[in-house]
Amino acid sequence: MLVGCLGGNLENDISYPGDVMYESTNATIVEVWEDGAVVETTYPVLSFDFNESSAPSAFLSYTVRGTHVDETVDASQTTVVNVEFKHHGFHTLELIADYEDTTDERGDDSRHLNEIVVRIEKRIEWRESSTNEPMPMTLDSRHEVGDRPPSVLVLASTVHNPALIANLGGGQEVEVLWELIDNTQEACQFQPGTVKDGESASWNTVHFNTDEVHDLRVTYEEGQDTIDVDHTVDIQYEALETVPTA
């Protein structure tokens, strides 16, 4: 973590935005899909409290700034900057506290500046109900900010074969095949399974070739019972974020 100041001659007892309090420097975006369409996206919000910062004159504003975020608050109204994150990856953020010029500021901007790193991951929840032709789930796990790709994809998939309510002809087993398809249209991982009537079967795996697009596919023979499909995919990064201060 880098600590410093821009402009002015500050005394040694002046606090920098290194005194900014933040309880967390990592969070997760959650995206929910139903029957092939996004129905909800929850973006995490992290808070940065400049209450412990001090300067030779009154603060004017507090700012948290990065490639995809830029939030400023009036220092006379609050010391807390709430930042919403919409991109997964490593965000390098500047914590800026601007204060009034004093007679010894030499005409420069008066501010304290600190830099931290925040890790934002992503979870995708996918559900299809009563389908006899499951759709491929496209997974674009390429990092959206920063220079480092995700460290791993964690996949958990469950196929449920609902029991027939009106048991006229009886339910049947369903033979399924899970495949993780890479950008060459080859299956880099796969798993066959059998789902009995009224039961479920799951495939859990991890994948480390993360900086490309994949399809997660579930296929089964035509004429079998309709099925429900649930996927959960976590796009995870190595824990390289700045340590929280609160």
Predicted regions and their residues:
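Secretory targeting signatures
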Residues: 1-22
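Acidic, Ser/Thr
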Residues: 45-57, 158-160
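Short beta-strand segments within Ig-like beta-sandwich modules, predominantly Fibronectin type-III
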Residues: 69-77
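Residue-level recognition of secondary-structure-to-loop junctions
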Residues: 81-87
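Hydrophobic/tyrosine-rich beta-strand signature of extracellular beta-sandwich/beta-rich modules
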Residues: 93-97
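C-terminal edge strands of extracellular/lumenal beta-sandwich accessory domains
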Residues: 101, 170-184, 207-246
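Acidic, Ser/Thr/Pro-rich low-complexity intrinsically disordered segments
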Residues: 133-196
